[in-house]
Regions:
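Mg2+-dependent prenyl diphosphate-binding active-site environment of isoprenoid biosynthetic enzymes
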Residues: 1-199
Length: 202
């Protein structure tokens, strides 16, 4: 929505695209919670914890379907953008599940994972706003790049929150990624550190 200020903010398509992005985001959270076996989401019981994995997965699928239905009215370019974003979301999840391959640097691999899983969705959200409001091509491309970088930064900050915050502050169970062995910026940097106090976190 903020990106639409670079064009005509009054375009109804901008609002519809924002709904598409939020539905897509929510769908990925349902699926992520199943894969992570997360008991909480934003401080409340997760869907998979309350209703089971099957219902949580199907709910995520339903949200993807509703997003696709809305997209049909936004034109082929919007549909293509969403399809490519969905592709990156899935690729990011696959890369995270498989881990670094063939001696790849774990930190570089992790950055590529969050670029696909989080950066792509941020970038697409901003691109929709700029594109559908009629902003110039130069502005659309610049904002898309900016959105991806903001998405990566957001995820890196979230990694720190997972370690450093209390449940009443973040709505999350602290140390979830650490306990489950999920590589994050924090754990990857600690593994490279030499200080004894850092090694205690591993």
């Amino acid at each position: 929505l903020l990106a639409a200020n670079y064009g005509n903010m009054g375009e109804r398509q901008v609002i519809e695209a924002a709904v598409v992005c939020e539905l897509t985001h929510l769908a990925t959270l349902y699926h992520d919670d199943v894969m992570d076996e997360a008991p909480l989401r934003r401080g409340v019981e997760s869907a998979n914890e309350r209703w089971g994995n099957a219902v949580a997965i199907l709910t995520g699928d339903y949200l993807f379907a509703k997003a696709s239905d809305l997209l049909a009215d936004l034109g082929p370019e919007a549909v293509r953008l969403q399809a490519r974003t969905f592709e990156r979301l899935v690729i990011g999840q696959i890369k995270e599940t498989q881990g670094p391959q063939n001696g790849a640097d774990p930190l570089e691999h992790y950055i590529s994972v969050i670029a696909d899983k989080t950066g792509s969705l941020f970038g697409t959200s901003i691109r929709f706003g700029a594109l559908l409001s009629g902003a110039s091509t130069q502005v659309v491309e610049a904002l898309t790049t900016f959105g991806e970088e903001i998405g990566i930064a957001f995820q890196l900050a979230d990694d720190v929150i997972d370690i450093a915050s209390e449940t009443n502050e973040s709505g999350k169970t602290p140390g979830t990624d650490l306990r489950e062995g999920v590589p994050t910026l924090v754990t990857l940097l600690v593994q490279k550190a030499d200080r004894p106090e850092d090694q205690k976190l591993i």
